[in-house]
């Protein structure tokens, strides 16, 4: 949201006269993406914490700012304005600044554990990509629009291209059921940032300190296997199938000698997880629920 589609919209706006065909193609991609990406935002302005580079914080809303910059009205301007304004208010209510007023490394509070190997003290300032909204002319309709709530969205929304099922609760929070996302180049805590069974806009997720004790491994929304004092979790999937009737199926192996078949099935008030474990030796399995916020 704050990378490929963001830069594509910059190109679409700046090059719409010189390269109209490509610019329109990028705008159309953004229209399609927006109709799915809106499911990542909760009613209070928070976005789903998922994946890497989370220390960029309110860059999460930069896509919507780029939509306005490129004049792509997927939803009414009041809806887009509401997404942006609520998002900023949510972030600025969190302890994300140090005593000098500088952005800290972390997510909703200072937290080095969630950071990437490529992060540095100035990394959080990628959040300022969202300030692209300040490039809108005074006559842009977004400034005149009245802030609106999110439109009525499906309580369950399927994203087959990313092997995700998005759930929207009546209180406005968002859950993503996931399987199959994997970063081949192994960023820090790739399993925790991409391969948990569920991610939630309120509860967030844990990153481990180590895998040698259960409290340090903290496998929230994961199935962990203990072997010789070490905990193993899902890092990647061998097979993934998404079926609207059966749910999200994955076959994975946390270590040699163990294979697991997992099915995630969404319901109106939550989801069900079913695991079939094939193990060549005795082991201890531990499953975690959502972490405390």
PLM feature segments, named:
Residues 1-65:
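Aromatic-lined, polymer-binding surfaces characteristic
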Residues 4-19, 60-75, 112, 126-138:
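Well-ordered alpha-helical scaffold segments within catalytic/enzyme domains
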Residues 18-40, 75-91, 141-156:
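Extended, well-ordered alpha-helical scaffold segments
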Residues 33-41, 95-107:
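Active-site-adjacent bridging/hinge elements
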Residues 52-73, 84, 103-125:
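C-terminal, helix-dominated tail/subdomain
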Residues 124-144, 156-157, 161:
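C-terminal, beta-rich DNA-binding module of retroviral/retroelements integrases
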Residues 151-237:
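Low-complexity, glycine/alanine/valine/leucine- and proline-rich hydrophobic stretches
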Residues 206, 210-293:
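Extended repeat-based interaction scaffolds and adjacent low-complexity, acidic/S/T/P-biased segments
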């Amino acid at each position: 949201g704050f990378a490929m589609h963001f830069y594509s919209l910059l190109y679409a706006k700046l090059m719409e006269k010189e390269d109209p065909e490509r610019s329109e193609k990028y705008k159309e991609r953004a229209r399609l993406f927006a109709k799915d990406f809106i499911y990542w935002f909760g009613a209070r302005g928070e976005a789903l914490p998922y994946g890497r580079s989370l220390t960029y914080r309110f860059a999460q809303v930069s896509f919507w700012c780029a939509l306005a910059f490129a004049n792509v009205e997927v939803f009414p301007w009041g809806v887009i304005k509401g997404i942006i304004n609520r998002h900023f208010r949510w972030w600025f209510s969190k302890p994300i600044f140090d005593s000098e007023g500088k952005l800290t490394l972390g997510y909703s509070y200072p937290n080095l554990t969630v950071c990437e190997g490529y992060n540095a003290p100035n990394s959080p300032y990628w959040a300022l990509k969202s300030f692209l909204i300040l490039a809108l002319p005074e006559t842009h309709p977004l400034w005149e629009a009245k802030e609106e709530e999110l439109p009525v969205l499906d309580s369950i929304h399927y994203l087959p291209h990313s092997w995700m099922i998005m759930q929207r609760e009546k209180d406005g929070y968002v859950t993503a059921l996931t399987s199959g996302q994997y970063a081949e180049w192994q960023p820090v805590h790739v399993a925790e940032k991409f391969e948990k069974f569920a991610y939630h806009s309120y509860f967030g997720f844990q990153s481990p300190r180590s895998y040698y004790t259960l409290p340090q491994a903290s496998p929230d929304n994961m199935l962990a296997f203990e072997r010789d004092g070490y905990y193993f979790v899902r890092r990647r999937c061998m097979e993934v199938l998404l079926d609207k009737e059966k749910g999200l199926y994955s076959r994975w192996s946390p270590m040699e000698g163990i294979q697991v078949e997992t099915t995630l099935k969404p319901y109106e008030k939550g989801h069900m997880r079913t695991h079939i474990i094939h193990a060549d030796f005795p082991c201890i399995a531990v499953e975690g629920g959502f972490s405390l916020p």
